[in-house]
Swiss-Prot record:
UniProt-listed Pfam families: Autoind_synth
Gene name per UniProt: expI
EC nos: 2.3.1.184
GO molecular function: N-acyl homoserine lactone synthase activity
Catalytic activity annotation: a fatty acyl-[ACP] + S-adenosyl-L-methionine = an N-acyl-L-homoserine lactone + S-methyl-5'-thioadenosine + holo-[ACP] + H(+)
Biological-process GO terms, alphabetical: quorum sensing; signal transduction
The protein's name: Acyl-homoserine-lactone synthase
Family stated for the protein in its record: Belongs to the autoinducer synthase family.
Keyword Isomerase in annotation: no
Record-linked SUPFAM superfamilies: Acyl-CoA N-acyltransferases (Nat)
Enzyme class: transferase
Role description: Required for the synthesis of OHHL (N-(3-oxohexanoyl)-L-homoserine lactone), an autoinducer molecule which binds to ExpR and thus acts in virulence (soft rot disease) through the activation of genes for plant tissue macerating enzymes.
Length: 212
């Protein structure tokens, strides 16, 4: 069983925070070589604070995937870290949340689930379910070109708001991730193909996915 649930920074145990931060270091520093701050084998920044909520994907008690949410009214990576990478950033008005630090740990997924796994798709779906549960207008995020491709292939009806250049002079994109029914059920259809889940099981949060 793969379980994905939301938990606020303030309610996270130190052990779970350390686990998330260590996994993030493995993804963003070791594998992707992003310019991130790492201390004692962990990656974290000023946006990991009392305004932050995490989605955690857990299999057999171990975190295998996660994403970070911050309401746009609070300091976040779009209005902070990434702002200068765009020429006059055009941020939509509305009740949006920002997502960042999306990762699926390849080694843990391979060991706990196998190569044919729904972790990435399920985390995408959990993001939609979270935004709908708490009545947000949608999700805003900044992604690299490979992540843009992954999102497009998932069936999520994303839209590009603006293109910028990272510190490495690589294309990055400000995206709107909608929470519409069509996107939701496109993801659900793909997940049910490779798991034992029924469609009606996949519209909630926490999200429980029986694996094939």
């Amino acid at each position: 069983m793969l379980e994905i649930f939301d938990v606020s920074f303030s309610l996270m145990s130190n052990n779970k925070l350390d686990e998330v931060f260590a996994l993030r270091k493995g993804t963003f520093k070791d594998r992707l070589d992003w310019t991130v701050n790492c201390i004692n084998g962990m990656e974290f920044d000023e946006y990991d604070n009392e305004h932050t909520t995490y989605l955690l994907g857990v299999k057999e008690g171990k975190i295998i995937c996660s994403v970070r949410f911050i309401e746009m009214k609070y300091p976040n990576m779009i209005t902070g870290t990434f702002f200068s990478y765009f020429d006059g950033l055009n941020i939509p008005e509305g009740n949006y949340i920002e997502s960042s630090r999306f990762f699926v740990d390849r080694d843990r997924v391979r060991n706990l689930i196998g190569t044919r796994n729904p972790a990435c798709l399920t985390l995408f779906l959990a993001m939609i379910n979270y935004a709908r549960k708490y009545h947000y207008d949608g999700i805003l995020t900044i992604v690299s070109h490979p992540m843009l491709t992954l999102l497009k292939r998932s069936g999520w009806r994303i839209s590009i708001i603006q293109q910028g250049l990272s510190e490495k002079q690589e294309k990055i994109y400000l995206l709107h991730l909608p929470t519409d029914d069509e996107s939701r059920y496109a993801l659900i259809e793909r997940i049910t193909r490779i798991t034992n889940a029924e469609s009606e099981q996949l519209t909630t949060l926490p999200l429980l996915v029986p694996l094939a």
